[in-house]
Amino acid sequence: MTWICFLAGLALLAIALGIAQHHLGTYMARVFTSDKDTRVETWCYRVMGVNPRAGQTWKSYARAVLAFSFCGVVFLYALQRLQPWLPWSLGKGSVNPAVSFNTAISFVTNTNWQAYSPEATLGHFVQLAGLCVQNFVSAATGIAIAVALIRGFVGHGEHTIGNFWVDLTRCTLRILMPIAAVAAFLLIAGGAVQNFTGFLHVTGVAGGNQVIPGGPVASQEAIKELGTNGGGFFNGNSSHPFENPQPWTNMLEIFLILLIPFSLPRTFGKMVEDVRQGRAILAAMVVLFTVNLCAMAAAEFSGHGTAARLAGAPMEGKEQRFGLAQSVLFANSTTMTSTGAVDSMHDSFTAIGGMFTLLNMMLGEISPGGVGSGLYGMLVIAVIAVFIAGLLVGRTPEYLGKKIGPREMKLSDLYILVMPTLVLCGVALSLAVPGLRSSVNTSIANPGEHGLSELVYAFTSAANNNGSAFAGLDASTNWLCAALGAAMLLGRFVPIILILALSGALVEREPVPVTAGTLPTHNALFTTLIVFTAILVTALVFFPVLTLGPLAEGLI
């Protein structure tokens, strides 16, 4: 009966996403191509001193993104350091500099890596004015970058790729806020907490004292999932009953996680005026998502050991109210996107099951990926796939009528190399430098192969702006706070700059006519080429470290 209920829920989720992505994708395309501004948007532009009709070159667009994000880091860092003097601080003290630095970068980069216990560290004001605000604007920034890249394919001999301030404002006001508001009301109806109380001291049934935390949880939970942010109001994240009370709210959160990433391919298709192109990208995302979901489920349900046999499945670290099937679906969704929220502890998965959560991020989080980042990551894979196909037949590669020249390929290759470089260099430094290694060894709760997996997972999560963790690693040390903070910063903004530069290169190119030798990029063959290109790139880079960590652990 449990399996029947889960499969029925999975079918309903797929149907709901299929319907929603069609309408939301079309709506987002209208939002970013409209010439009209709402009154609220006009007021925002006046306050910011922005001319909404002025286009920006890719360099100007990049400067705006970096300046806005820098201000966000400074503001969020200051809020944490000044917390004792802020309202609704609940008596919490100032957050230490290393954790404040790490947290500020984490939320501005859409990572939401948490090297602290939220309910024990932060008051309501920092949660609302700091973290919740960044959940909105960091998600909007990612979507804006994806739209800027699409304009690179659409533009013909131009120099501008849109206006960052307009894209940011429209995305926040017209897309994220309305959906998040509806989702918050649904979560409240399901039992999620939404109040402004502090800690409630009560006497338990057995007569002992108990402290029950409260706060504006549902409102932050909604945008945390919708914006693929992932940072929890509580340390238990979405496994906490105040954030995610019931099985149906769990499915709702999975729906929110996947909604925008799976809708953006249609936005892409509508903006390039060929929805078949969007369908090909969407199909590649769905194939990778489904294959990894099935593989992870198979690994978890085949868990070994006496406890697993008695429970019917390896239930350590999983919530009884969700069960193994929903836990696996949530884990696959949160690591296939850049969300990082958890309703079960990934560190407690079987060795091979945990490897698939790691592998999902190593793919570059492209199926469907984070809001914005998933689409532009998949489009880079598509550009590389077109180049490989061009080499096979001896033709100059083209994609959507644009020739892919040396400049475009260099930018695409650099984009692909950023994340693996950050992950492997971060792990190597942590283990090769004696002083750092001794610090890391004290942070690893499970030495050996699993300890290596915990460290690799941390740097992979940070560099991909995911934010989930193998919780056996204590990441609050000065070295890991600084190193993971740097990985989050570089893993977010170096790819963004490369994507904007790629858009700038494409928008200047004139379209070339379609000929009999042009590679069709809207059929099943091209979708297959994209899938295998993504797998090939990941296998070449990460297979050695996977053999030393989760594969070795799983075979022992």
From Swiss-Prot:
One Pfam family name is KdpA
Q: Give the residue range of the signal peptide.
A: none
Q: What is this protein called?
A: Potassium-transporting ATPase potassium-binding subunit
Family listed: Belongs to the KdpA family.
Q: Where in the cell is it found?
A: Cell membrane
GO molecular function terms here? P-type potassium transmembrane transporter activity; potassium ion binding
Kindly indicate whether the keyword Methyltransferase belongs to this entry.
no
| Superkingdom of origin organism | Bacteria
Topology class, membrane: Multi-pass membrane protein
Q: Please give the chief subcellular localization of this protein.
A: membrane
Q: Which residues form a coiled coil?
A: none
Residues annotated as transmembrane: 1-21, 60-80, 130-150, 173-193, 245-265, 281-301, 374-394, 416-436, 482-502, 529-549
Disulphide connectivity of cysteines: none
Per the record, GO CC terms?
plasma membrane
Keywords from the UniProt entry = Cell membrane, Ion transport, Membrane, Potassium, Potassium transport, Transmembrane, Transmembrane helix, Transport
Summarize the protein's role: Part of the high-affinity ATP-driven potassium transport (or Kdp) system, which catalyzes the hydrolysis of ATP coupled with the electrogenic transport of potassium into the cytoplasm. This subunit binds the extracellular potassium ions and delivers the ions to the membrane domain of KdpB through an intramembrane tunnel.
How it assembles, according to the record, is: The system is composed of three essential subunits: KdpA, KdpB and KdpC.
